[in-house]
Amino acid sequence: MAAWCSPRWLRVAVGTPRLPAAAGRGVQQPQGGVVATSLCRKLCVSAFGLSMGAHGPRALLTLRPGVRLTGTKSFPFVCTTSFHTSASLAKDDYYQILGVPRNASQKDIKKAYYQLAKKYHPDTNKDDPKAKEKFSQLAEAYEVLSDEVKRKQYDAYGSAGFDPGTSSSGQGYWRGGPSVDPEELFRKIFGEFSSSPFGDFQNVFDQPQEYIMELTFNQAAKGVNKEFTVNIMDTCERCDGKGNEPGTKVQHCHYCGGSGMETINTGPFVMRSTCRRCGGRGSIITNPCVVCRGAGQAKQKKRVTIPVPAGVEDGQTVRMPVGKREIFVTFRVQKSPVFRRDGADIHSDLFISIAQAILGGTAKAQGLYETINVTIPAGIQTDQKIRLTGKGIPRINSYGYGDHYIHIKIRVPKRLSSRQQNLILSYAEDETDVEGTVNGVTHTSTGGRTMDSSAGSKDRREAGEDNEGFLSKLKKIFTS
């Protein structure tokens, strides 16, 4: 006896030495036979054609360690055959793969396949090397359990009932693994859910692509129409979505008569099932399009104009339709050197001089839409805010505009002329609310005097009576 074993097939040659010519005179040699499948280490001789005598069909033979053949004796023979190892040992239970009980309804089976196929689809699990295998197992399990004929055979015989070496099931068309492309089955089943509460087929299978768009502060605040290049799956322009090469024709599926469904007769039962030849399309593409490879869709570069709504914020995502697909666009808004944003309100700083802060006046400020003349009230303090109503950003989820808040910043000069220093020293002499000291001034109460050692003493004396008149006016303004 000799045996050759592969992962799924076992090839066995069993025999005894051929009878000598003298001993075998008048003895008819066996014509051969067929060894059928049996589990473990048992072989079952189903039929040996001629010369079996009283040893009828299905006589049991046992393979024991030591490569010895024992059991029912028969005429010398040599028989070589191959048989498939039991698929039930190599395959998981289809019900366990889909996570449904054995009495599950077709609706429950389809729903389970829907949810698991979404979870394990290779496009959404690119980092998982086992996702493709799991996805194929789901397709195989669903193909069997969704067909009542195949399901009955599976319940009766298990996976071995579908093997080509086993004819007891009465069906020999199933060959292990899904007979249709798992992707096609996925599209077909998910297409049936397009109007169901489980979601939209296109939103599940073709996940919307995400893009990042850079915007300036003003573009985000005012809105803009911006051109953008996207790569998106759309109808193949070469074959117009038909899948076949232009100038060629698709063949009518003779297996199902173009209906996409085939009829299976199993005794008293007549079942309708998806055509295994064309996958339910009703036609067969013999010359697929060289661009889309028969899918009818191909990735294309498209230049689209995206209307950016006024008031979008940094990190905000919007959904945009592009052809028959949708894309997600996330905005990245650059910081402005002038404005700071708080919702629909904007903030900016306005620098004014000491004289403007004390005496008041006007100043020009940069607004979001135009240059604004701001009225400065006398005596304004640093960091005090001036509110410009309705000069902010449009409210994206409601009506109206935000406000523009101007923060006052008083610019203190780092250098003074002699005249300016004398004026400030004279003003400091009359200050009454100073805590501490002022450089160059000995007393800061009314009637105080400046330090003789100060750099401005000589200049003040040289200034004469004209300066005294100006200082008197300035003091009256400051102390009034």
UniProtKB/Swiss-Prot annotation:
Written domain comment of the UniProt record: Modulation of apoptosis, i.e. proapoptotic activity of isoform 1 and antiapoptotic activity of isoform 2, is J domain-dependent.
Compartments, as annotated in UniProt: Mitochondrion matrix; Cytoplasm, Cytosol; Postsynaptic cell membrane
Lineage: Eukaryota, Metazoa, Chordata, Craniata, Vertebrata
Organism per entry: Mus musculus
GO MF assignments: ATP binding; GTPase regulator activity; Hsp70 protein binding; receptor tyrosine kinase binding; unfolded protein binding; zinc ion binding
Entry binding sites for Zn(2+) 2: 253, 256, 275, 278
Lipid bilayer topology: Peripheral membrane protein
Residue ranges, compositional bias (Polar residues): 439-456
Location of the region described as Disordered in the Swiss-Prot/TrEMBL record: 437-468
SMART domains on file: DnaJ
Zinc finger (CR-type): 223-301
Descriptive protein name: DnaJ homolog subfamily A member 3, mitochondrial
CXXCXGXG motif repeat windows: 236-243, 253-260, 275-282, 289-296
